[in-house]
Amino acid sequence: MKTQIQAIHAREILDSRGNPTVEVDVTLECGAMGRASVPSGASTGAHEAVELRDKDTQRYSGKGVLKAVSNVNTEILESVRGMNAIDQEQIDHLMIKLDGTSDKSRLGGNAILGVSLAVARAAASALNLPLFQYLGGEQAARMPVPMFNILNGGVHANWQGPDFQEFMIAPTGAGSFKEALRWGSEVYHELKAVLKDAGYSTAVGDEGGFAPALKKNSDAIELIIKAIERAGYTPGSQIEIAIDPASSGFYENGLYHLRSEGRKVDAQELINLYSSWVDKYPIAVLEDGLAEDDWSGWKLLNAALGDRIELVGDDLFVTNVERIQRGITENVANAVLIKPNQIGTLTETKAAIEMAYGANWGAMVSHRSGETVDSSIADLTVAMGTGHLKTGAPCRGERVEKYNQFLRIEEDLGSRAFYAGHDAFVR
């Protein structure tokens, strides 16, 4: 079978926020084709791979991606045409070398990732394998706990509600992914009713979660617990809670500005707040509890809570092996958030996950707030056996598509599928 790359074509499409992004088609000599589209974040880490934007204010307020598209259709195509799509690492490393920068700013992380993912899809198609099996082999059968972001704050809610960006539920007590998805959907709808009864807006944010104008951050947890119970489930043993404060968004001059509560706190005071919540509520995961460059604060956080809950670094690590290695060496967390577009290739994404595993850390795959209907992260999650992922609320087509892909994968695996459940998290 001829799995050499014959053609690559990129185009500018829209993401779930109506902003331009890159979509790439890769066609092989055997006729197999792979298509991938690239997401975009709102609360981006300062150390992420660069998303190349045109900055032409006459188009899409400067957010066009025609330069990235052109880079795929010219320079990248010319370099990888004729290469074997099965040689994923070789192709990815060639694109990294071709770009020549540490942050993929010349060709664009969005251009490179689009090609990287489309190549993998084309190769899987040529071999007549589902993507998760192509990437993970026969042993890939661990279904993840879905982390449903059902209540939004921070930048995702235009700073109209809680300071903390995401309040999630994790149905660890379910027996399968299919059951976990049902539990999550039921709690989501109960939360809508709870909010409506309390006189709050039930409009949804970028990731499908509700974005009520709450007075206190803890109100979000109280409302979610009420919704879990009203749906007929037990907080803790059946459904746990995860929080992503996205603390870099309210960190300034060494202090954390809790706008909704009208106070500024230092790292230790914020850690004390988290500790009191872990004592009081069934919290299993805390992501980006402190700012991306507050390394000394993270050490204190890990010392306080690292043996009780999973502490995930997102902006702290940006899926970058150099930053993850520093985190392991300095003992600042116990898990890594994995976003392929933070680093820019499938090969580097897998390396980040493997580095986390090597340190007995957790790895949680994630979507971005500006998404597409590309479901590659679902296949990647099962392929790498990460056991948990977050991809928004069970609402909005671009979020639900990932969850539906997991249903297909679980069905495809049949009796071989097993649900990560309570073992999903490091604790």
Curated annotation (Swiss-Prot):
Pathway(s): Carbohydrate degradation; glycolysis; pyruvate from D-glyceraldehyde 3-phosphate: step 4/5
Signal peptide positions on this chain: none
One Gene Ontology term of the molecular function aspect: phosphopyruvate hydratase activity
Enzyme Commission number(s) of this protein: 4.2.1.11
Cell compartment(s), UniProt: Cytoplasm; Secreted; Cell surface
InterPro entries from the UniProt entry: Enolase (IPR000941), Enolase-like_C_sf (IPR036849), Enolase-like_N (IPR029017), Enolase_C (IPR020810), Enolase_CS (IPR020809), Enolase_N (IPR020811)
Active site per the UniProt annotation: E207 (proton donor), K339 (proton acceptor)
CDD domains: enolase
Keyword Cytoplasm found: yes
Record: residues binding (2R)-2-phosphoglycerate: Q165, K339, R368, S369, K390
Subcellular location, principal: cytoplasm
Stated family: Belongs to the enolase family.
Name assigned to this protein: Enolase 2
Organism: Pseudomonas syringae pv. tomato (strain ATCC BAA-871 / DC3000)
UniProt gene name: eno2
